């Protein structure tokens, strides 16, 4: 993942240390977050003598990564092989702490990685594409076949490198509101925006027209810049 010895590396879900060992060979210390206490003795055994490993037994979805960055004295680099069932919620959780995270190297099921890196108008484009794309630069760096794992899963995996942009792709007045607008637009995928955004605004058609966006368009056709502009034009 291109880390330097002095980097503050946090590994989420190290399991039995398949990634942890090579990481410890590259950096001075690794901070690992592992919920499954049954794995900890084997993890410690397999990484003994390689480097300094700190392990916290906690649910990553409950971790305040801003606090972790303050404690470790600088921006974090996150490394993780994410279980499919928590990959989207965890990514959205990490996104909240973007000011404290310089970059992330994450392994997802291929389908999720493609959604994150998707362009407007493509089938995979959705909430994750827009929210990540505003603040992060996403690039699929590697695809991993099922045969790389024991037991092999039924799907391909992909490694995604997410680097924080120097500035958001488009100016956003209220980040929380932007997130709500994006969720609203994609909440009912096949609906046109004037219908999909009814939950957010008493007069969605007027709001869209005020933003210069055709109310008959669907969420998957809007660029990240258009989403930002739409959110900025919101007046309840």
Residues of each region from the PLM?
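An accessory alpha-helical subdomain
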Residues: 158, 162-164, 170-204, 214, ...
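Short, amphipathic C-terminal "tail helix"
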Residues: 213-236
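Catalytic cores of RNA-modifying enzymes
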Residues: 1-181, 220, 229-232
